């Protein structure tokens, strides 16, 4: 038996988003044991749970055909996401960054929720009628959970389909395709494609009266702080949950990498559904390996003890 220390200061003090290894700072020690893959035992815990927190990452959307931009092969042209998704990159070359996000927006407009998204949304709707709660905390910016029907939803890294004005701060939904005429036909990801070098005045602009400021995607970039109010709400949900389900997350991006280990530290069952083990897997009670579109639906299906309404 090995003990792994995890830092457990309040989440709102860990509001930086970036790729870095799991914390090894001193804190509450989590007992590391081999997690169970017994579905029947998980279903017993699921049947008893009144407040379920579902934490999702890029893996849940990969089965919808969404390109993963973190990890092996995660390139757009010759840049990795962490070299484009930064305030510094936008300041240096807003045209290139907007091409990158325009490409991602156009791709996402063609994608649909997969069985994992749908299982989570159906579970939320079904359990709500029983006076039980399911909340989804996602690192994804693709809005597929929303499209699937999830309503108790925290998009902690923002959305591809919202913009924020760099001048007045106005945040608006935006599903235009293309988002501006200058980006039409731009954004191809191949490494030999040259930058469009769009003049800044032709990039997406704010339509608030008298503003006309440059818009940026309303997403959290590497090195930026997350909304402390939003994280406060997330923390409340994690403190109240009596079951935590982790789906398709690599457990390397903070602060989300802390969420499930923090829940496990107070003795709440945590079930991980993932294609492979992560640095946090051995701190969880359950682990189900394989495509989440296959493993998750039977885990969240109606339990025999549920009343049919």
From Swiss-Prot:
Chain coiled-coil ranges: none
Note describing how the cofactor binds: Binds 1 zinc ion per subunit.
Family: Belongs to the sirtuin family. Class III subfamily.
Highest taxon of the lineage: Eukaryota
Compartment list: Mitochondrion; Cytoplasm, Cytosol; Nucleus
Binding site for Zn(2+): 165, 168, 206, 211
Enzyme Commission number(s): 2.3.1.-
Binding site for NAD(+): 57-76, 139-142, 248-250, 274-276, 292
Domain Deacetylase sirtuin-type: residue ranges: 36-306
Domain notes: In contrast to class I sirtuins, class III sirtuins have only weak deacetylase activity. Difference in substrate specificity is probably due to a larger hydrophobic pocket with 2 residues (Tyr-101 and Arg-104) that bind to malonylated and succinylated substrates and define the specificity.
A Pfam entry, by short name: SIR2
Swiss-Prot/TrEMBL GO biological process terms: peptidyl-lysine demalonylation; peptidyl-lysine desuccinylation; protein desuccinylation
This protein's UniProt keywords: Cytoplasm, Metal-binding, Mitochondrion, NAD, Nucleus, Transferase, Transit peptide, Zinc
GO cellular component: cytosol; mitochondrial matrix; mitochondrion; nucleus
PANTHER family on file: NAD-DEPENDENT PROTEIN DEACYLASE SIRTUIN-5, MITOCHONDRIAL-RELATED
Reactions accelerated catalytically: N(6)-malonyl-L-lysyl-[protein] + NAD(+) + H2O = 2''-O-malonyl-ADP-D-ribose + nicotinamide + L-lysyl-[protein]; N(6)-succinyl-L-lysyl-[protein] + NAD(+) + H2O = 2''-O-succinyl-ADP-D-ribose + nicotinamide + L-lysyl-[protein]; N(6)-glutaryl-L-lysyl-[protein] + NAD(+) + H2O = 2''-O-glutaryl-ADP-D-ribose + nicotinamide + L-lysyl-[protein]
Cofactors, names only: Zn(2+)
Root EC class: transferase
Transit peptide range per the UniProt entry: 1-35
Residues bound to substrate: 101, 104
Native source species: Xenopus laevis (African clawed frog)
Protein name (database record): NAD-dependent protein deacylase sirtuin-5B, mitochondrial
Single GO molecular function: protein-succinyllysine desuccinylase activity
SUPFAM superfamilies from the UniProt entry: DHS-like NAD/FAD-binding domain
Active site: 157 (proton acceptor)
Function field: NAD-dependent lysine demalonylase, desuccinylase and deglutarylase that specifically removes malonyl, succinyl and glutaryl groups on target proteins. Has weak NAD-dependent protein deacetylase activity; however this activity may not be physiologically relevant in vivo.
